[in-house]
């Protein structure tokens, strides 16, 4: 039962207690399908792209560059962990799932720690006068979920929005595994002219019992 629909294998403590994220059978082998979904969700929201996803995925030694139809780039950076391995990392001093927004005048980076890193610092002086963007305070997520259960209204981050974020994570993971550029059609959710990548979009689930 502990495997769910994943391929069968003998029990190993390395597969549980959070360490399952490092194995392709349970994640993408790069934490792209777990931590990545939280971060990509924020990028989708900031780009007003909840209705779509990046269309091109370019894996590099240092990152995966995901490009939207409007030209905006979502870059998944690879950072070295304490043991020297390089891969997508989702925990820094800014908290979990840090995101950096880069524009023509500078950048703003933050995570769930509440700390913000603004460059240049002159941008920080404009924060109080900046119009608040759409969305809810992160502390309201739980309340929003329970309210939706009662009212039957969609949550702020509804299943359709999260589905597209997860597809983007899967596409980035497959580009990284295959080590080549991939292009996806958001309408059909299939890779363009790439039979091998399309075969990897699905695998037969194992019977639970």
Residue ranges and their predicted role:
Residues 1-160, 164-209:
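Contiguous beta-strand/loop segments that form the cofactor/metal-binding neighborhood of enzyme cores
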């Amino acid at each position: 039962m502990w495997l769910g629909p994943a391929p069968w294998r003998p029990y190993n403590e390395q597969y549980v207690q959070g360490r399952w994220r490092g194995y392709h059978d349970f994640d993408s082998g790069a934490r792209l399908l777990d931590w990545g979904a939280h971060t990509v969700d924020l990028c989708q929201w900031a780009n007003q792209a909840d209705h779509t996803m990046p269309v091109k995925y370019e894996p590099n030694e240092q990152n995966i560059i995901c490009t939207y139809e409007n030209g905006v780039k979502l870059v998944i950076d690879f950072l070295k962990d304490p043991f020297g391995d390089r891969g997508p990392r989702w925990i820094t001093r800014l908290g979990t799932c840090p995101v950096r927004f880069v524009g023509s005048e500078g950048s703003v980076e933050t995570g769930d720690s509440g700390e913000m890193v603004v460059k240049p610092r002159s941008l920080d002086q404009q924060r109080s006068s900046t119009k608040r963007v759409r969305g809810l305070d992160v502390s309201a997520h739980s309340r929003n979920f329970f309210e939706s259960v009662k009212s039957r209204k969609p949550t702020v981050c509804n299943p359709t929005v999260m589905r597209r974020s997860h597809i983007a994570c899967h596409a980035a993971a497959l580009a990284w595994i295959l080590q080549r550029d991939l292009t996806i059609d958001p309408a059909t959710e299939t890779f363009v002219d790439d039979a091998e990548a399309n075969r990897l979009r699905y695998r037969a689930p194992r019977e639970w019992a």
